[in-house]
């Protein structure tokens, strides 16, 4: 299994251009939060409802498992920084705005991905996740690596 530093080095290969980096620092958190919003609104089996789970929670459990495999408490910090505010917001807003959470999340998700692809067009390199889907989980860590020192 790759170390966090190995993931960052490989991810960084297709993220050298200043404009692309700026676009990523805006779009990656938006994609993360909007994906959680979309997953939050997808109907779940009755057994999930009885214990208060939804598809966002399931996704976060898989993401956390991957992050734990990287053996870094700072990674867990980024996970919490991304997941906890989103879950609190969705839990509070879902009864109030309902389907609008889904619609607004889809709009943000699509626009943020368009931004990502524009960034990669400027960069002149394909997104890393074309090579390995796990890079979709590395992106948020890489974006926050400037804020939280990962001792790269």
Model-derived features: where do they sit?
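Membrane-proximal soluble regions of multi-pass membrane proteins
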Residues: 1-14, 18, 121-152
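Alpha-helical transmembrane segments and their cytosolic membrane-interface
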Residues: 2-53
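Helix-coil boundary and interhelical linker segments in multi-pass alpha-helical membrane proteins
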Residues: 36-54, 88-105
């Amino acid at each position: 299994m790759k170390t966090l530093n190995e993931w960052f080095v490989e991810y960084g290969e297709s993220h050298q251009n200043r404009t692309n980096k700026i676009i990523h620092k805006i779009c990656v958190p938006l994609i993360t939060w909007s994906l959680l919003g979309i997953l939050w609104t997808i109907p779940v089996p009755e057994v999930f409802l009885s214990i208060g789970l939804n598809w966002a929670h399931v996704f976060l459990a898989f993401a956390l498992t991957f992050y734990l495999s990287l053996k870094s408490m700072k990674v867990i910090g980024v996970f919490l920084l991304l997941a906890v505010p989103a879950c609190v917001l969705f839990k509070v807003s879902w009864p109030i705005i309902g389907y609008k959470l889904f619609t607004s999340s889809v709009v943000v998700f699509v626009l943020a991905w368009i931004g990502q692809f524009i960034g990669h067009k400027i960069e002149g390199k394909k997104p890393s996740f074309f090579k390995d889907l796990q890079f979709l989980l590395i992106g948020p860590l890489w974006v926050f690596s400037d804020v939280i020192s990962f001792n790269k």
